[in-house]
Amino acid sequence: MATSLSADSPQQLSSLSTQQTILLLLVSVLAIVHLGQWLLRQWRRKPWSSPPGPFPWPLIGNAASVGRASHLYFARLARRYGDVFQIRLGSCPVVVLNGESAIHQALVQQGGVFADRPPFASFRVVSGGRSLAFGHYSERWKERRRAAYGTMRAFSTRHPRSRGLLEGHALGEARELVAVLVRRCAGGACLDPTQPIIVAVANVMSAVCFGCRYNHDDAEFLELLSHNEEFGRTVGAGSLVDVMPWLQLFPNPVRTIFREFEQINRNFSNFVLDKFLRHRESLVPGAAPRDMMDAFILSAEKKATGDPGDSPSGLDLEDVPATITDIFGASQDTLSTALLWLLILFTRYPDVQARVQAELDQVVGRDRLPCMSDQPNLPYVMAFLYESMRFTSFLPVTLPHATTANTFVLGYYIPKNTVVFVNQWSVNHDPAKWSNPEDFDPARFLDKDGFINKALASSVMIFSVGKRRCIGEELSKTLLFLFISILAHQCNFKANQNEPSNMSFSYGLSIKPKSFKIHVSLRESMKLLDSAVEKLQAEEACQ
């Protein structure tokens, strides 16, 4: 028997075909969507996956959006794009690192890859291109850094004698600073402490580096120190002269600022060079070094007259002035900025000031001055210092870095010779790490037994990390402790009631408070300071 299809079989086949087509289309669309998502995830992990970032405008890139407070702009972008993102300043692509994880992965785990500096015009100006801080990363640079670090520690914190000399310098300048502040606040007056503090800190570094100090009214010294702000503004992250070199081609404010920057550097270099030449002339062969300049000169001369078969290491004579310029310039600016912030915080948080003074009185007493050996027994004083550095983050963004090889950070590809900005502020104000990071609370650094939480204290990022970590970090922390301990032990600091509570700041390499006034008064008298300095002078005369 023959078998035949029913009359409606073609329609049934047509309906089935349509359903299959629709189903196939749906499956295809879903497959394409999933494939696209998978490819996107894979693409982000591929070497050609650059960090995301905002749209850059022609010619200027994102420069107009950065603003004065670049660290806050970077933090806002990090919330949108993640801890690793890219902006463009002029024609220069810049990768910005935020957060402890990204920064640690780059600067610590890949220290050598992120240790270079960009070939910026302003960097070439500093110390005639011989600067350690601004110089290119190389084997020679590493030798110079080791020599500079070793000599610096030898004249500051390594040996008991050098620590004693450093404490003596700090004591003498603290005594002079207190005298100036109290005298200018006579009769209930208020003063801006900026200039006296800059001179006091610079005098300590001058004694360490050059073996001399200056009066608080020395016009030449004051002029030399008055340009810290302009210097920081030119070399800080986002400086237009470095990312838009075409601005040098015609008259404009940026070119004017850069030419002033060149003159500031010439003046500073000439100041140090004069010290260098005088030291070479007066240096007695075989004598112990009088200061850091002597030590560098002796080290360089030893290298120059060494066995030709030995591998060269240390500093050349022509490197000495630039190295001293780095140490003196960076230390006095960083320390004076930090000390100004400490005094501001004392006046803004009088309960904190009172607690610092109470701990000093309990541990040190009122019949002597604080010294470095007291530091382990003053946890709240140290907590105040750590919280001040975290809260202010007065060095919010490091000097620009550059990569020496192709690399990855958090899965993003960063090619060789990329300019990299490191946002230290983002680490110090990360709400995932710090409870209520916008609150000033020194007690956060104390454990349940009242001791310093060392793990938390080491998380504060102010002197950078990795190969470019500041060689003066230990010296800076030592001097900050000595200055603020002596000042708090001897003085009371009060805010000017006629000034508004909100403050304005200048932004550059560091965040500096603009002009402000405070009232400074003695807790007792100058007798203890005077007798301590007299005793120190008598001991020096006997040596």
From Swiss-Prot:
Q: Where is this site: Major determinant of CYP1B1 17beta-estradiol hydroxylation regiospecificity?
A: 395
GO MF assignments:
estrogen 16-alpha-hydroxylase activity; estrogen 2-hydroxylase activity; heme binding; hydroperoxy icosatetraenoate dehydratase activity; iron ion binding; monooxygenase activity; oxidoreductase activity; oxidoreductase activity, acting on paired donors, with incorporation or reduction of molecular oxygen, reduced flavin or flavoprotein as one donor, and incorporation of one atom of oxygen
Reaction equation(s) it catalyzes: an organic molecule + reduced [NADPH--hemoprotein reductase] + O2 = an alcohol + oxidized [NADPH--hemoprotein reductase] + H2O + H(+); 17beta-estradiol + reduced [NADPH--hemoprotein reductase] + O2 = 2-hydroxy-17beta-estradiol + oxidized [NADPH--hemoprotein reductase] + H2O + H(+); 17beta-estradiol + reduced [NADPH--hemoprotein reductase] + O2 = 4-hydroxy-17beta-estradiol + oxidized [NADPH--hemoprotein reductase] + H2O + H(+); estrone + reduced [NADPH--hemoprotein reductase] + O2 = 2-hydroxyestrone + oxidized [NADPH--hemoprotein reductase] + H2O + H(+)
| Metabolic or biological pathway, per its Swiss-Prot or TrEMBL entry | Steroid hormone biosynthesis; Cofactor metabolism; retinol metabolism; Lipid metabolism; arachidonate metabolism
What is expression of this protein induced or repressed by? By polycyclic aromatic hydrocarbons (PAH), beta-naphthoflavone and 2,3,7,8-tetrachlorodibenzo-p-dioxin (TCDD). Up-regulated by diesel exhaust particles (DEP). Decreased by estradiol (at protein level).
* Cofactor(s) the protein requires to work: heme
Q: Any idea where this protein resides?
A: Endoplasmic reticulum membrane; Microsome membrane; Mitochondrion
- Positions annotated to bind heme: 470
InterPro entries referenced in this protein's UniProt entry, alphabetically: Cyt_P450, Cyt_P450_CS, Cyt_P450_E_grp-I, Cyt_P450_sf
Source organism, top-level taxon: Eukaryota
- Activity modulation comment: Enzyme activity is increased by cytochrome b5. Enzyme activity is increased by liposomes containing anionic phospholipids, phosphatidic acid and cardiolipin. Inhibited by naringenin with an IC(50) of 5 uM.
Record flagged with keyword Calcium: no
Topology versus the membrane: Peripheral membrane protein
Q: Which UniProt keywords apply?
A: Endoplasmic reticulum, Fatty acid metabolism, Heme, Iron, Lipid metabolism, Lyase, Membrane, Metal-binding, Microsome, Mitochondrion, Monooxygenase, Oxidoreductase, Steroid metabolism
A GO biological process held by the record: cellular response to toxic substance
A GO cellular component annotated for this chain's UniProt record is: endoplasmic reticulum membrane
**This enzyme's EC code(s):** 1.14.14.1, 4.2.1.152
Q: What does this protein do?
A: A cytochrome P450 monooxygenase involved in the metabolism of various endogenous substrates, including fatty acids, steroid hormones and vitamins. Mechanistically, uses molecular oxygen inserting one oxygen atom into a substrate, and reducing the second into a water molecule, with two electrons provided by NADPH via cytochrome P450 reductase (NADPH--hemoprotein reductase). Exhibits catalytic activity for the formation of hydroxyestrogens from 17beta-estradiol (E2), namely 2- and 4-hydroxy E2. Metabolizes testosterone and progesterone to B or D ring hydroxylated metabolites.
**Known PANTHER family for this protein?**
CYTOCHROME P450 1B1, STEROID 17-ALPHA-HYDROXYLASE/17,20 LYASE
> What family classification does the UniProt entry report for this protein?
Belongs to the cytochrome P450 family.
The name this protein carries in UniProt is: Cytochrome P450 1B1
From which organism does this entry originate?
Rattus norvegicus
Q: Which gene encodes it?
A: Cyp1b1
